[in-house]
Curated annotation (Swiss-Prot):
The family this protein is said to belong to: Belongs to the XseB family.
GO molecular function terms attached to this record: exodeoxyribonuclease VII activity
Role of this protein: Bidirectionally degrades single-stranded DNA into large acid-insoluble oligonucleotides, which are then degraded further into small acid-soluble oligonucleotides.
Protein name in UniProt: Exodeoxyribonuclease 7 small subunit
Alphabetical UniProt keywords: Cytoplasm, Exonuclease, Hydrolase, Nuclease
Biased composition (Acidic residues): 68-85
Length: 85
């Protein structure tokens, strides 16, 4: 049996998520053959992994930008007795 060329990865998170949602909808209709369902499932796993990696990268970037994930209270003693007010 000849293998199909694997579809390329979507360019961004939104495209991958949209494709994954469409794929799930097609599978939920229950009209695909077993072979087609397995191919769609395989594609869905790849898309889910891509989305998860994108989310992890975004979370890491947010943590980096916000000071390594440290919570910073808005009302700090330093801010109240500063010279800027």
């Amino acid at each position: 049996m000849a293998k199909k060329n694997a579809p390329s990865a979507p360019a961004d998170f939104e495209q991958a998520l949209g494709e994954l949602e469409a794929l799930v909808e097609r599978m939920e209709q229950g009209e695909l053959s077993l072979e087609a369902s397995l191919a769609e499932f395989e594609r869905g796993i790849a898309l889910a992994r891509q989305c998860q990696q994108a989310l992890q990268a975004a979370e890491q970037k947010v943590r980096l930008l916000s000071g390594e994930g440290e919570e910073v209270p808005l009302d700090t003693p330093d801010a109240e007795d500063g010279d800027g007010e």
